[in-house]
């Protein structure tokens, strides 16, 4: 073991792909925030990576690609086994179903300490009951030494649906780098289109890949409903959509058909999300399913009230009528009513925003998350002594 050679332990983080996303952002934040003298890290991508890897600030982190082919590419697990035999990590940490099968390669490569994280579920299994996926998770259950779900909701699901013993689970919330999200100074309105810069406007926004599970379609429909039902608000609100993905053409089509395309800014992918957040007045997360949303935490850290769907881990973040509002998923009318409530009671924007920031500082800090992960890793390694 590397510990016996007086080297820092190596953690191999196995992901399906290193690209834009909440799971990937959480891994990068964890690596960047861990003390340099504590652990070494490697990131193994079952497929490939994008320039998102540049967000890793540590020079000694190796990123590997296994170039998994679409469909059943069983050879990828042999390539993974060879890589693990070469780099000899002390801990293997896989994340989500798409990387779970890497646990077998880890076992065969002789990696004693194996961790699996559950960060959320995909559009084809939003409630976690897909029989094939449940069977696969149960088959691999004996190989995992420690499970780390992001939310209490996922922890309960692991126990009840996947039959994981409670004593093998350590629930850890995502954390946000509060210092990165400024709440003082002038808003950087110069980042916005000219028609979005008036201080009299209420800017509603979201950040995330435009993907069916994120369901920004419902957000656009809710915004259309707000404008159609209250024509006088046309000069009072704007919608900011940060992100790219397969839903964008449909969202543009809806806005054009409704005649409100001039009220929506499709900002695309951005590397200045923290600054864009500061231009907003209200953050919305319309997802069909969520683990623990990084973007909700980032919005709360920016003192933004949050409207989120009442799914997954969202109710563990947003306290209804204190830091924002929870609405049913895929319900544009309910979401539009929440918009209107803030529009009519704008003092709540400040009140709920400040409460959200305080909640981030007390419960969802990056330091707390990092400490919790280090405790898991330390405890696992101590078992070998």
Language model segments and positions:
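A short helix/loop element that forms part of the nucleotide-sugar donor recognition site in Leloir-type
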Residues: 181-198, 203
């Amino acid at each position: 073991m590397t510990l016996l050679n007086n080297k820092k332990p190596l953690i191999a983080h196995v992901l399906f792909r290193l690209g834009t996303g909440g799971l990937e952002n959480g891994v990068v934040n964890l690596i960047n925030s861990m003390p340099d003298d504590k652990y070494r890290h490697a990131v193994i991508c079952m497929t490939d990576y994008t320039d998102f890897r540049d967000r890793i600030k540590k020079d000694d982190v190796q990123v590997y690609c296994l170039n998994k082919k679409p469909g059943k590419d069983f050879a990828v697990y042999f390539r993974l086994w060879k890589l693990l035999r070469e780099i000899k990590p002390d801990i293997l940490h896989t994340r989500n179903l798409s990387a779970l099968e890497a646990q077998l390669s880890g076992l065969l490569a002789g990696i004693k300490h194996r961790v699996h994280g559950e960060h959320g579920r995909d559009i084809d299994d939003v409630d976690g009951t897909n029989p094939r996926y449940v069977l696969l998770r149960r088959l691999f259950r004996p190989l995992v030494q420690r499970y780390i779900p992001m939310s209490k909701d996922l922890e309960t699901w692991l126990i009840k649906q996947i039959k994981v013993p409670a004593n093998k689970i350590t629930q850890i919330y995502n954390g946000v780098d509060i210092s990165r999200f400024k709440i003082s100074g002038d808003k950087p309105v110069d980042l916005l289109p000219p028609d979005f810069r008036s201080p009299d406007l209420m800017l509603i926004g979201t950040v995330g890949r435009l993907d069916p599970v994120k369901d920004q379609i419902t957000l656009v429909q809710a915004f259309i409903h707000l404008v159609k039902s209250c024509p006088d608000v046309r000069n009072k609100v704007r919608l900011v959509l940060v992100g790219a993905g397969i839903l964008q053409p449909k969202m543009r089509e809806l806005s054009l058909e409704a005649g409100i395309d001039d009220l929506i800014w499709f900002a695309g992918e951005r590397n200045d999300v923290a600054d864009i957040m500061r231009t907003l007045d209200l953050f919305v997360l319309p997802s069909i399913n969520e683990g623990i949303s990084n973007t909700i935490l980032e919005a709360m850290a920016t003192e933004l009230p949050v409207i989120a769907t009442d799914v997954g881990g969202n109710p563990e973040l947003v306290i209804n009528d204190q830091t924002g509002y929870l609405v049913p998923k895929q319900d544009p009318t309910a979401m539009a009513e929440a918009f209107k409530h803030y529009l009519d009671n704008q003092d709540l924007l400040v009140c709920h925003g400040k409460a959200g920031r305080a909640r981030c500082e007390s419960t969802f800090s990056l330091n707390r998350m990092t400490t919790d992960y280090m405790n898991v890793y330390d405890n696992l390694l101590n078992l070998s002594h």
